[in-house]
Amino acid sequence: MAMAKARKPREALLWALSDLEENDFKKLKFYLRDMTLSEGQPPLARGELEGLIPVDLAELLISKYGEKEAVKVVLKGLKVMNLLELVDQLSHICLHDYREVYREHVRCLEEWQEAGVNGRYNQVLLVAKPSSESPESLACPFPEQELESVTVEALFDSGEKPSLAPSLVVLQGSAGTGKTTLARKMVLDWATGTLYPGRFDYVFYVSCKEVVLLLESKLEQLLFWCCGDNQAPVTEILRQPERLLFILDGFDELQRPFEEKLKKRGLSPKESLLHLLIRRHTLPTCSLLITTRPLALRNLEPLLKQARHVHILGFSEEERARYFSSYFTDEKQADRAFDIVQKNDILYKACQVPGICWVVCSWLQGQMERGKVVLETPRNSTDIFMAYVSTFLPPDDDGGCSELSRHRVLRSLCSLAAEGIQHQRFLFEEAELRKHNLDGPRLAAFLSSNDYQLGLAIKKFYSFRHISFQDFFHAMSYLVKEDQSRLGKESRREVQRLLEVKEQEGNDEMTLTMQFLLDISKKDSFSNLELKFCFRISPCLAQDLKHFKEQMESMKHNRTWDLEFSLYEAKIKNLVKGIQMNNVSFKIKHSNEKKSQSQNLFSVKSSLSHGPKEEQKCPSVHGQKEGKDNIAGTQKEASTGKGRGTEETPKNTYI
């Protein structure tokens, strides 16, 4: 039997040893005596090796180290002897076997199982968009051409031109649209053989915010991290880079919009490692999928050569209903919660965003379990977050002196969030939580934890359940971290920095922190804040917030501000009444996803501006309905705009 026919590592090992000439076999045993064979294992003694024939040596190595490690041991010796042809043949067997080892590793990832990624999954809507040709075009990323829905299976397809198959895909979407869940689901589906069968030998998931934990800024270390194995056969994995797919999840968490304004001016070595991949300087023939929020596109675009752009739009109406059924284990609770949401246009529309849908479900479940009647009517995503936070903050005791008193915990969460964003940090050690007087395990509604292997040690790190919670508490920090009599010098400086960076970055949408703070600064939000979080906003502080609101609204209306919708035909009249849009055309495209054939999916990109002061126009988006042109447009002066929601990672549901 030739080695190429070997089906198992033990068979390949035996044939590799048997192929050695007598003198080479003696040399291999000599090198094995002095070699550090496996972590924690002593070298083989001369007496153990003396007189052994190939089959005996194979049995000895397998009994001491197991099949896979035994192959690695022999490979080390053969490399020292420079028997590269035999190394190549044996490596191929090792690689083929390691694919299955890695697939099993992915299938068993505990944190993904807990997040429900491998269980009930709700589909999200994806549409293809062209790559942006210039930074200015980012404000109007849907040029005048047909936008088509795209499936995950077809992300790297070229249609009828195989030579033009994209090797780099940018998946962009607002916070909470389901990018992380989709990215992880792709890796799991590949591992189970249902996605890209035969196309990729390895699909690696890289969380951009976790790259900081790499021990070294080397590609080898990144692969060890992805495989969860410091002995992974890196050389063999990289032998055919065109059969590798790296999913870089959360580019916006690697490089935040305010990065250059803070203490961090240059790229860290670990960021540079990912930049080399993105620029195609490292492994230029591998495939890449990069997920990001729109804000980071201005930083990402200069790194790209040719990329396919895909936009994630969140849930369809059917998926919204399915999500409630999967989230609530009690059918009556699910029906009651969905009924509440359906009767509230703001909640129903917000639940198109999977992350906000999770927040709404968690909030409603918390209210029901406490026996409370839901009387609130949230007006925007900020109100939804306030309702969630006020529900899950620990209650004040009668004396107001509890270590977990409501206001103390709120202030601590705010200070942790602000410190993290100001220093470009999204992972926190337990010592950092203690510094802010936070007890991580008792605040699972806001903080999640994971254990990471750092060298020989295992360390626990915390993060906010989603970056949107960190943004929310960052916005709240301007109200609670000082003496509360005024916004405070430090807070005023930070707010001014927000405004300055916003002005310098031109047409970018506002950050989520700014959106939260703008909503909070509205006068009718003050009483809601005071009631929910047990602190009073002084007249001076209210005046400071009013000034910020005026500045922010002025800046917003002096620029083209992108607003993305996924609409259904029945919602058009409400949309036109709710906001005025400039140079907008609607693309109507029949969707088989709808329950009724009379309803059709709308994908809209609009440009909001301040009439005559508008500096940039977005071209119309044209489409067809069953072969006939059906274009509706309006050219009225823009007057309002709303930010977008957030993404969340639950304990055992979709997000």
UniProtKB/Swiss-Prot annotation:
According to the record, mutating residue 252 to A results in: Reduced release of IL8 following invasive bacterial infection
**A GO term from the CC aspect:** nucleoplasm
Principal localization? cytoplasm
Q: In which tissues is it expressed?
A: Highly expressed in basal and suprabasal epidermal cell layers with lower levels in dermal fibroblast cells (at protein level). Widely expressed with highest levels in heart, brain and skeletal muscle. Also expressed in liver, colon, dermis and epidermis. Little expression detected in myeloid cells or peripheral blood mononuclear cells.
Biased amino acid composition, Polar residues: 597-609
The NACHT domain covers 167-484
GO biological processes = activation of innate immune response; adaptive immune response; defense response to fungus; inflammatory response; innate immune response; positive regulation of defense response to bacterium; positive regulation of inflammatory response; positive regulation of interleukin-1 alpha production
Which residue ranges does the record annotate as region Disordered?
597-655
- Composition bias of kind Basic and acidic residues appears in 611-629, 644-655
Q: Which UniProt keywords apply?
A: Adaptive immunity, ATP-binding, Cell membrane, Cytoplasm, Immunity, Inflammatory response, Innate immunity, Membrane, Nucleotide-binding
List localization entries. Answer: Cytoplasm; Cell membrane
Binding positions for ATP? 173-180
Q: Could you tell me what induces this protein? A: By infection with the periodontal pathogens T.forsythia and F.nucleatum (at protein level).
Any single GO molecular-function term of the entry would be: ATP binding
**For the Pyrin domain, which residue ranges apply?**
1-96
Membrane topology term = Peripheral membrane protein
Please give the record's comment on domains.
The pyrin and ATP-binding domains are required to elicit cytokine release following bacterial infection. The NACHT domain is required for inhibition of CASP1 autoprocessing.
Q: What does this protein do?
A: Inhibits autoprocessing of CASP1, CASP1-dependent IL1B secretion, PYCARD aggregation and PYCARD-mediated apoptosis but not apoptosis induced by FAS or BID. Displays anti-inflammatory activity. Required for immunity against C.albicans infection. Involved in the innate immune response by contributing to pro-inflammatory cytokine release in response to invasive bacterial infection. Contributes to T-cell-mediated inflammatory responses in the skin.
List the PANTHER family: NACHT, LRR AND PYD DOMAINS-CONTAINING PROTEIN 10, NACHT, LRR AND PYD DOMAINS-CONTAINING PROTEIN 12
Instruction: Cite the record's note on assembly.
Output: Oligomerizes. Interacts with PYCARD. Also interacts with CASP1 and IL1B. Interacts with NOD1 and components of the NOD1 signaling pathway including RIPK2, NR2C2/TAK1 and IKBKG/NEMO.
Give the record's family classification: Belongs to the NLRP family.
This protein is called NACHT, LRR and PYD domains-containing protein 10
Identify the gene encoding this protein.
NLRP10
